[in-house]
Every structure is written in C-alpha cells, then in structure tokens.
C-alpha cells in the first residue's frame, strides 16, 4: 500500500499591498477587502504578514512583517474592514516599500527559511505601468509577486505582466 508523503508547508512572509484609490470605490473595494480577509484567515501559524494600502500615498499597518498570531490577524482584519477608497493611484511607492520590506527582513531570523511573497490587490488602473514593471524586474530578488485583479474590468495586461516579472501568478476576482 502506498503511503502518503506529507511535507511541511514552508513558513512565509507575505506582504499584502491593497489599492484604496478612487477607482476602487463601491464593489471593487468591498471585493478587495473580502479577498484580503480570506487571505489573512489562510495564514499558517509560522507565517508572518504585513499590509500596505495605497492611494495618493501609502501607509502600512506595521513597518515589518508580524507573526500571524490570532491577535495580530484580528487587528489586521479590523484595519482592512475600515479601509475606504478615495484619491489617486501612486502604486510605485507602495510596491517599492513592499519590496524593500521583503528584503530588509532576514528570511531565517527565527531559524526558518521563509518564502517571501508580495500580493498586489488592485484594479490596475495606474498611470506608471512601465515604472512599476521595471521596479519589479529590478527589485524582486528571490521574492515572488502575485497579482489579484479586482473589479468589472481590471487591467489584466498589466496584472499578468507584473505577476510574470515577479515569478508569480495573476488571479482575477470576477464581480458578482
């Protein structure tokens, strides 16, 4: 009889970057918040996370990844529920901060080798696509960038190219 091999899931440092610009108003921001809360619920006990929101500027819940302990995850979910959509779309600075933060953290500082991931949640309605793509190409290092397209017509072309540059995948969340 064949025995099932169960490998331990590697610990992850996940930085979620969420678009809260004006183009995300209405259903899009609600979808993005729901997706982010689902992702937070799927973090494992050895994972760490960080959330960066961006519109005209960017801000983060914590400056570095924090352990995915129940208390921190609940605090993050409350933060996400309170996000609103307004303002411009300055994506480059937010992604710069995410990639810098990913590489500032020692991936083995708790004795574990960690997968470093950036998850970009946006409708892709940005003006500086070329700068974004060259930033990802230049700074991704050994991290991976995944894109999640939100809204009725996300910029799938940009999202696919950004995910490819980050050696990740693009997922489109269809409007209900």
Describe each region flagged by the PLM:
Residues 1-176:
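Exposed acidic/Ser/Thr-rich ligand/metal-binding surfaces
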């Amino acid at each position: 009889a064949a025995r099932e091999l169960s490998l331990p899931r590697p610990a992850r440092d996940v930085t979620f970057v969420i678009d809260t610009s004006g183009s995300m108003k209405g259903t899009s921001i609600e979808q993005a918040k729901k997706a982010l809360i689902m992702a937070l619920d799927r973090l494992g006990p050895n994972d760490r996370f960080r959330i960066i929101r961006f519109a005209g500027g960017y801000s983060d819940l914590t400056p570095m990844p924090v352990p995915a302990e129940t208390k921190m995850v609940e605090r993050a979910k409350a933060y996400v529920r309170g996000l609103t959509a307004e303002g411009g779309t300055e994506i480059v600075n937010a992604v710069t901060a995410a990639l810098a933060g990913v590489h500032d953290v020692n991936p083995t500082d708790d004795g574990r080798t960690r997968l470093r991931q950036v998850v970009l949640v946006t409708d892709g309605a940005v003006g500086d696509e070329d700068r974004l793509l060259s930033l990802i190409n230049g700074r991704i290092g050994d991290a991976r960038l995944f894109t999640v397209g939100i809204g009725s017509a996300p910029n799938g072309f940009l999202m696919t190219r950004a995910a490819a540059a980050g050696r990740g995948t693009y997922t489109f969340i269809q409007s209900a």
